[in-house]
């Protein structure tokens, strides 16, 4: 008869070394969502690429929007709050993208004090056309499905706090650069 020092219960934790290495780091998840919102959900960038607008303000808006979303997600980058906050950011940016696309609003309206967020939303009538629902599904729904099916690496409390604080400072800097550039282009 042999002596067993450890008993196996058949239960495997998410914190096993192999699974922890395969899971996505929360910082990379923030970068992926911020990049998606800044590039794919930026209607101004796509309008500029097809020749309907200026490219430099669209790029500045991409940098500023990605930085703002990254900052927001770094603040809410904790284990229980990240996915709901990222869902809100993805669906909200898809809705705003539909409004910008259907109303052809210039990117400099982001730094205009007179512009309200409600002016960027799509009109109610456009919600029943084909463009806005398709944009909501492609730009918001599919990334939300990816997000909720992606395992994120569980970090210890101090490591998660360091990651969040580093992300807050980095993304604040990125947003400041993007919106400062957009403000200079709007003033010129």
Question: Where is each model-derived feature located?
Answer:
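Transmembrane and membrane-interface helices of multi-pass
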Residues: 2-187
């Amino acid at each position: 008869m042999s002596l067993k020092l450890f008993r196996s219960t058949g239960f495997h934790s998410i914190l096993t070394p192999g699974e922890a290495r395969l899971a996505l780091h929360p910082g990379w998840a923030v970068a992926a969502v911020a990049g998606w919102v800044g590039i794919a959900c930026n209607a101004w960038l796509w309008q500029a690429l097809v020749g309907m607008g200026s490219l430099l303000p669209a790029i500045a808006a991409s940098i500023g929007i990605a930085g703002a979303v990254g900052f927001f997600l770094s603040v809410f980058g904790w284990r229980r709050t990240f996915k709901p906050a990222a869902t809100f950011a993805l669906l909200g940016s898809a809705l705003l993208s539909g409004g910008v696309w259907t109303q052809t609003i210039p990117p400099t309206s982001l730094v205009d004090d007179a512009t309200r967020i409600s002016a960027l939303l799509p009109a109610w009538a456009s919600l029943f056309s084909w463009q806005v629902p398709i944009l909501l599904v492609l730009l918001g729904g599919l990334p939300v499905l990816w997000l909720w099916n992606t395992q994120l690496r569980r970090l210890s409390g101090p490591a998660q706090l360091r990651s969040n604080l580093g992300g807050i400072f980095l993304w604040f800097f990125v947003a400041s650069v993007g919106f400062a550039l957009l403000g200079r282009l709007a003033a010129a």
